[in-house]
Amino acid sequence: MYRKTYKIFENLLLIVINFFPQITKYRYIRVNGPSMEPTLKNNSILFMKRFNLSTDKLKRFSIIRYKDSVNKFYIKRIIGLPLEKIEIIDSKLFIDSEYQETDILEKNKNYSWMLKKNQIILFGDNYLNSGFDSRKLGPINLSDIQITHIR
């Protein structure tokens, strides 16, 4: 009797764990690829919250998931926020002309973006192997953000 009750409880718990993300604003996401290393390893699991454009505020250096124009998903870090001027000059990051101490940038590359009110700049943490981030794609629209990382 005890064993049967335990098995039923175990199965119910598995159902709840599997369906919890489907009925709430939270999701488990698997990291695919090395673009966020060393912060997030390939195949790591993240607990993330669905992003609501009208109520959620973005924070610089937060980790988010976004989708590109062919509905492929990427996990990246927010570097630039709406209405900011983001520049990378001689491997140094400037936000609205103020130098930001960081070691995130590759050598011998310069970039400059003036963001609109619905745009952000995203980089992967593995700057030499980051794939599809704003250095390749330019600014990302806020409407493309799917979920934000919960720490």
Predicted regions and their residues:
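Protein maturation boundaries and topogenic segments
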Residues: 1-74, 81-86, 135-151
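Acidic/glycine-rich C-terminal interaction modules and beta/coil loop segments
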Residues: 49, 67-68, 73-76, 87-151
